[in-house]
Amino acid sequence: RKDKDVDREEFLVSGFEQLSWVNIHKELEETFGRPIISEHDAKLLAYAEWKCAEERQTDRHVSLVALGSVGFGIGAGIIINGKIVEGQLGIAGEIGHMGINYNGKHAQNGIQGTYEYCAGTESAVRYMLERLYEFPESPLTEKSSYWEILDAYKNGDPLAVYAIDKMAWMLGYGIASIVYIINPDCVILGADYPDLPEFLEKVQRSVSQFVHPSIMENVSIRCTKLKEDTILLGGYYIALEKLFKNNLLLERIRQALC
């Protein structure tokens, strides 16, 4: 976590017995002999999206929320007025822990009612397993991964369609809360979610069930258009801005990359 009582660039590790309260920056800088900059992966993803967002062509102060899902979790980066929202302890955007099912029970890897449990990419695997034996013709098995489900979804497999559609609905259900809490100009889904019109339509339809039409008209919900490693690209931008202050140079680099 970020310790607000020390230098802003000092990061301490907690929650890992063998690394408890290790100053990661100090250790890495001594090892590599170079300055170290650390940031949360979802925040880097969001910053890269903001830098290259088409919405910025008309408004440089566009606010943006980017959602990423890696395995079980969901993380979000929030950009307002060109700044990453950090929060008191640097955990702003940890929306995966947001409860969306009051009756959710405690599970081995968390609470079943959390957003990431219901809408992270791994949720599609559970939804597939729920009805696996109802679809004997499906190519999916008990060992099928999310990516195999996604391939089957693209081929129109009914079981895969059920699993991905349910994930899409739950994803939209959570985005509706984000829209009301943050009121962003755009919400961008990371590359782990299907970049398919039918999937995005399901997400948008879910959001529209819980968000007033006048608000829906003023928020863009779309999939990422970046093809690069977005997290790495975000880290690149952050490092450049910390090392260089020439905004013109940075803008030319941004135009070349986007």
Question: Could you say what each language-model-derived stretch is?
Answer:
Residues 6-7, 30-34, 54-59, 102-103, ...:
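ATP-binding/phosphotransfer module of carbohydrate and carboxylate kinases, centering on a glycine-rich
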